[in-house]
Amino acid sequence: MLEMTIRALIVDDSALIRKLLSDILSQDPNLRIIGTAFNGKDGLEKIKKLRPDVVLLDNIMPVFDGLKTLAWIVKECPTPVVMISAFGERAEEITLTAFEYGAVDVIQRPEGILSQNMPDMAEEICRKTRAATKANLENLECMRNRELEETDINKREKIEKHRSRKETTSFVRNVLAIGASTGGPRALEKLIGSFPADIPAAVLIVQHMPAGFTASFSKRLDSKTALRVKEAEEGDIIEEGTVLIAPGNHHMEIVQKTVKGRKEEVAHLSCSPKELGSRPSVNALFRSIAPIYGSKIVSLVLTGMNCDGADGAEQVKKMGGKIIAEAQSSCVVYGMPKEVVRRKLADFVLPLDKMAEEIVKIIS
């Protein structure tokens, strides 16, 4: 069965970037560029007129910036939006805010046709553009509405909770290993923010995200939870009460190593080949922890396209760990958890808002 052609609109104030993205997307037989726009205001007019299947939207533009444009799209003309973002703290922060507004995913701004990474970047841009069209916009809107309903009292409680964190310990009773892709940033904010400060577990996360963005995402998540959240670095010791997020463009695996005369489990980062088009890979993390932690593991496979995580989940299950797959009812894209369910690997299939409670029951 032939796939329907996906109609894409590019909104970016740089003529060079519009041309590069047009050339990249045009190489995919399932994608067709129906128009380009040079700023947010121009983009809104073309969205109303052309009704694209997906919009690629620059986050920083004159006249009408990316966030204002995104807010209008979400409210007036719901369409999957993939943000185009450069590196830099301001650009990364705007992009993370865009996820709260309703963006589906983010792509790295292509730097030029001579870039050595252009083939990989082009493949990722096309893949994320295709995946965005499968997003459940109703679930995105429901998550957005819940976030906007949060009161100032709730926010103050989160800050106080954050200040009263418990001490971390390298004695690990349980490991929560989480994999997510499209729709993952908002899902992770909700899930990790629901964990109690004294949860008896170390938390390891692979979120498919470009290099550079995971550092900003880690800082943002750290400010919204009672747990310590950081982007993983080579040699980080696995500790209860700490959340390690795999850095973009690096696989994160857990290995055993002697540290100051004591055997510890630590993070090992590598740039070995991508798996299923992704680096970091959920499978790589799950495979590495299975023989080390065995029945101490609870692996969660959240929203995302394709099937990363299923092979690794099989290894975890063989070693006695538990598997939780996100239910279709709360997924932005029901791909990764769907494969886990299809292969009958899931011990639990739960909507996002029921996961934290079940996890606490399992590990207590």
Swiss-Prot record:
Which GO molecular function entries does the Swiss-Prot or TrEMBL record give?
Answer: phosphorelay response regulator activity; protein-glutamate methylesterase activity; protein-glutamine glutaminase activity
Positions of post-translational 4-aspartylphosphate modification: 58
Which cysteines link up through disulfide bonds? none
| Primary localization class, coarse | cytoplasm
UniProt cross-references to InterPro entries, sorted A to Z = CheB-like, CheB_C, CheY-like_superfamily, Sig_transdc_resp-reg_Me-estase, Sig_transdc_resp-reg_receiver
Q: Which Gene3D superfamilies match?
A: 3.40.50.2300, Methylesterase CheB, C-terminal domain
Its annotated compartments are: Cytoplasm
Q: Which UniProt keywords apply?
A: Chemotaxis, Cytoplasm, Hydrolase, Phosphoprotein
Q: This protein's superkingdom?
A: Archaea
Record PTM: Phosphorylated by CheA. Phosphorylation of the N-terminal regulatory domain activates the methylesterase activity.
Task: Name the catalytic site residues.
Answer: 181, 208, 308
What residue stretches are annotated with the CheB-type methylesterase domain?
167-364
Task: Kindly state which reaction or reactions the protein catalyses.
Answer: [protein]-L-glutamate 5-O-methyl ester + H2O = L-glutamyl-[protein] + methanol + H(+); L-glutaminyl-[protein] + H2O = L-glutamyl-[protein] + NH4(+)
Q: Could you state one GO biological process linked to this protein?
A: chemotaxis
Q: What is known of its domains?
A: Contains a C-terminal catalytic domain, and an N-terminal region which modulates catalytic activity.
Role summary: Involved in chemotaxis. Part of a chemotaxis signal transduction system that modulates chemotaxis in response to various stimuli. Catalyzes the demethylation of specific methylglutamate residues introduced into the chemoreceptors (methyl-accepting chemotaxis proteins or MCP) by CheR. Also mediates the irreversible deamidation of specific glutamine residues to glutamic acid.
Q: Which family does it belong to?
A: Belongs to the CheB family.
Q: What is this protein called?
A: Protein-glutamate methylesterase/protein-glutamine glutaminase
Biological source species: Methanosarcina barkeri (strain Fusaro / DSM 804)
Q: What is the lineage of its organism?
A: Archaea, Methanobacteriati, Methanobacteriota, Stenosarchaea group, Methanomicrobia
